[in-house]
């Protein structure tokens, strides 16, 4: 018989840097998860992606055991890294803050493909381009 799910927790945590301190500790504590066990497992699994923010979905079962799935970094984080900027534009229609090439967009779309609900790579690229436009990043050919 399958274990009964009692809670699902979604967090965005820096890769390899999960600590029991807020915001991770309180969110996991409320769900009844072994905080130290989760942070060790998460840090081990994401050690190769240091510096990235990794979304994680934690499923908590009735017996207080848990399992988690790591996702790909959010598109805005990847776009900021590709455009070499720290912050997106507050006025994306008038104030452009950076540029990315179609090749960089394609690379980001390929990375994000498994987490996007896109049928093909072109659709994923259009999604990433839309995110770039809303951040004030120009897409060059």
Swiss-Prot record:
Keywords: Methylation, Ribonucleoprotein, Ribosomal protein, RNA-binding, rRNA-binding. SUPFAM superfamilies: Ribosomal L11/L12e N-terminal domain, Ribosomal protein L11, C-terminal domain. It comes from Lactobacillus acidophilus (strain ATCC 700396 / NCK56 / N2 / NCFM). Belongs to the universal ribosomal protein uL11 family. PROSITE patterns: RIBOSOMAL_L11. InterPro entries: Ribosomal_uL11, Ribosomal_uL11_bac-typ, Ribosomal_uL11_C, Ribosomal_uL11_C_sf, Ribosomal_uL11_CS, Ribosomal_uL11_N, Ribosomal_uL11_N_sf. Forms part of the ribosomal stalk which helps the ribosome interact with GTP-bound translation factors. One of its GO terms (molecular function) is large ribosomal subunit rRNA binding. GO terms for cellular component: cytosolic large ribosomal subunit. One or more lysine residues are methylated. It holds the Pfam family Ribosomal_L11_N. This is Large ribosomal subunit protein uL11. One of its GO terms (biological process) is translation. Part of the ribosomal stalk of the 50S ribosomal subunit. Interacts with L10 and the large rRNA to form the base of the stalk. L10 forms an elongated spine to which L12 dimers bind in a sequential fashion forming a multimeric L10(L12)X complex.
């Amino acid at each position: 018989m399958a274990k009964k799910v009692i809670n699902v927790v979604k967090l965005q945590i820096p890769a390899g840097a999960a600590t029991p301190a807020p915001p991770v500790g309180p969110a996991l504590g409320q769900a009844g998860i072994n905080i130290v066990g989760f942070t060790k497992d998460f840090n081990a699994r994401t050690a190769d992606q240091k510096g990235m923010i990794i979304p994680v979905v934690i499923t908590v079962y009735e017996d207080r055991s848990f399992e988690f799935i790591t996702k790909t970094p959010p598109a805005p984080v990847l776009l900021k890294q590709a455009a070499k900027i720290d912050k997106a534009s507050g006025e994306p229609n008038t104030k452009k803050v950076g540029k990315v090439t179609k090749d960089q967009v394609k690379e980001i779309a390929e990375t994000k493909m498994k987490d996007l609900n896109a049928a093909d790579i072109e659709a994923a690229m259009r999604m990433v381009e839309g995110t770039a436009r809303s951040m004030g990043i120009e897409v060059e050919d």
